[in-house]
Amino acid sequence: MRVLDSAPVTLGRGAQNDLSLDSDDFASARHAKIEPRRDGVWLEDVGSTNGTYVNGARIGKPRRLAPGDVIRVGSTDLRYER
């Protein structure tokens, strides 16, 4: 579990990410970013090769997350809870 504060959280295979998925061969080195904003928490794909998914649908632009959403980065599933 990771608690979000006001800072964005980066996800990917590279060690430079806040949440490193180093054992996931399908995650890009820099894959996605989760960013708390005034109007909610947003997920953005940052140019990954295999895409970022929410509830099974690939996102093409930033998407606001809702509690219970399942985020897929590479072959890793993460659940967003408020």
List the model feature ranges, each with a label.
Residues 3-82:
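Forkhead-associated
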